[in-house]
């Protein structure tokens, strides 16, 4: 399982529409609007790096109103809770 955080800058009037569009993409688990140098963060969980590449370059990058993205790939999860089991449910 590959987990990535996609930092996204958008045309602000389209923020809600883009959030909905992102959530409609298979592999996008969560979307947050945030303060700071980026407008949104999408949490992505896919099986393989190739899927992540396609998702970022072909699906997310093609959405109207997205100005820029930066992708962070998680190496390891540290949590008080066992999130691995939760994230693995229904993802084949």
Predicted segments with their positions:
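A compositional/biophysical signature of low hydrophobicity enriched in polar/charged and small residues
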Residues: 1-92
């Amino acid at each position: 399982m590959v987990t990535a955080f996609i930092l996204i800058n958008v045309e602000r009037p389209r923020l809600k529409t883009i959030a909905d569009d992102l959530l409609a993409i298979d592999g996008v688990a969560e979307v947050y609007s945030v303060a700071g140098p980026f407008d949104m963060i999408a949490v992505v969980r896919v099986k393989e790096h190739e899927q992540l590449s396609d998702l970022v370059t072909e699906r997310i990058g093609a959405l109207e109103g997205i100005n820029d993205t930066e992708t962070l790939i998680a190496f390891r999860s540290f949590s008080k809770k066992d999130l691995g089991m939760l994230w693995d449910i229904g993802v084949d």
